[in-house]
């Protein structure tokens, strides 16, 4: 197990700027983090940026609120299977031969865990965007009109490549590449009026409005084999023998 694990080291950096005036305030912040997983070849780099803006005018009768955040993450997912095969692997067997080739016992469901991590790639990118804008207008002392719009967006793009020399999924396919992508978006729009009135012993609050929301999702998965070389990994899908022979 020691050959496929490590002491994970992580670091985080933050910076923020804020300011404004009596009618306007703002805050902008950024965050960077690098995280190493305890499994070799696992971890991620992430950058996150946020912006908040508020403004009021017309003697505070009209107020604007704007919030936005953007996150970009690059991940190395590694292979959890390496931990399982590290437990099953013969502890007295070598990891490699003298010529550098990986030792592999010809047994059912038994793979060299170090070879799994060294010969193959499993990584991905994720982007998230969140946006919200809100406007409040005090039409009367006890009547407020509000409009609110928000949107969330997420994109994932993952890639796997199993070497032509990897007994773990790659050898019997002449190299195996997998790509997966997905897009999700969510939109929300609301507009409403709020009436508030206080009486001697009670309060009356009435809200009337309209709300619309939309959720969309689409994804795509591709798996191809029979590659002439491992040099370009999953970036060389056009060279796949499966594709050239009409199998995909």
What are the residue ranges of the model-derived segments?
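Residues embedded in well-ordered regular secondary structure
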Residues: 1-40, 78-81, 115-123, 135-140
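Glycine/serine-rich loop-strand microenvironments at binding/catalytic pocket rims
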Residues: 23-26, 135-153, 167-169
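Surface-exposed loop/interface segments of Gram-negative outer-membrane beta-barrel transport/assembly proteins
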Residues: 1, 38-42, 48-130, 148-248
